[in-house]
Amino acid sequence: MKISSKYEKELRKLFELSKKTYIINFQLRNEELISNFSDVTDEEKINIIKEGIKIACQKKNSTEIENLMLSISFFRLYDRSEFIEDYIKLSKKEFHEEHETIASYFQRFHLPQTIDCIYELAISNFEKYQWDDNFALVRKCCFALGDINTPKAKEKLELLLQSEEETIREHAMEQLKRCDFTNKDIE
């Protein structure tokens, strides 16, 4: 896929500066990335990142997806609805490591239209999560379903109660006890 010439320079700069991310007080920081894009509008940042996601998916480049997700976070764009379809597509791709981040972003949205996707992510059998006996991804998905708080979300949590894994059942039950599931199932 050809990068649109409009965003080619910005994407290269974004990827280069993303490599300079560091940790202070257990928080990821990248002041240089933020300052280099300070004159770029949020809409332009969204368009640049969306273009980058398309290209990274085509190349199956996990590092680029990670850098793009970091950029979304640094620019505080994670709750922008323009990314919902990208998050849905990325949640189904195994080549990257950002599934837990995506589950957390879904949790922020509280959108009934993401329920099926969140459930599919919770039951996905991606190889990289098969070692995780704490089921961190599943727990984040359960929280996202709980925060959506609709009858359909409750149904998906009840399906997770049927898991052979006790920890998954516990995560689902935690949300079933926490929520009242009275929000409307409007997609």
Give, region by region, the residue ranges found by the protein language model.
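Long alpha-helical scaffold regions
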Residues: 17-18
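Short inter-helical turns and helix N-cap capping residues of alpha-solenoid HEAT/ARM repeat scaffolds
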Residues: 61, 94-95, 126, 134, ...
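Amphipathic alpha-helical scaffolding segments comprising HEAT/armadillo-like alpha-solenoid repeats
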Residues: 2-12, 42-56, 78-93, 111-127, ...
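Charged, low-complexity interaction regions
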Residues: 22-24, 60
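Structural detector for internal amphipathic alpha-helices that build alpha-solenoid repeat scaffolds
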Residues: 28-43, 55, 62-79, 89, ...
